[in-house]
Amino acid sequence: MKLLFVMMLLFFMFLWYYNVNFLSFLILMEFLVITVLFFIIGYEINSWLFLIFLVFSVCELVLGLSLLVSMNYELGHQKLSVMDLIY
């Protein structure tokens, strides 16, 4: 239970800290995916669950990067570097 509380606290701290731009938010999401993957490996949960989670995390990464590239194409590099997530 303490581990879950610490992970939630880290998630909200990183979410508050990385609320600067979209790329930092994507890096935060990948950090959380790697944390959950280590949790699955550490507790030796079913290998099929590991593969399914790995497939979903790769799809999430590809979707996020494609959104970043399309936003860079539409808005331009200068506007993307100062854009906030709330925009």
Swiss-Prot record:
Query: Lineage, please?
Result: Eukaryota, Metazoa, Ecdysozoa, Arthropoda, Hexapoda
Q: What does this protein do?
A: Core subunit of the mitochondrial membrane respiratory chain NADH dehydrogenase (Complex I) that is believed to belong to the minimal assembly required for catalysis. Complex I functions in the transfer of electrons from NADH to the respiratory chain. The immediate electron acceptor for the enzyme is believed to be ubiquinone.
> Where in or outside the cell?
Mitochondrion membrane
Please identify the protein, giving its name as recorded. Answer: NADH-ubiquinone oxidoreductase chain 4L
A single cellular component GO annotation: mitochondrial membrane
Q: Where are the transmembrane segments?
A: 22-42, 49-69
- State the UniProt keywords alphabetically: Electron transport, Membrane, Mitochondrion, NAD, Respiratory chain, Translocase, Transmembrane, Transmembrane helix, Transport, Ubiquinone
Which reaction(s) are listed as its catalytic activity?
a ubiquinone + NADH + 5 H(+)(in) = a ubiquinol + NAD(+) + 4 H(+)(out)
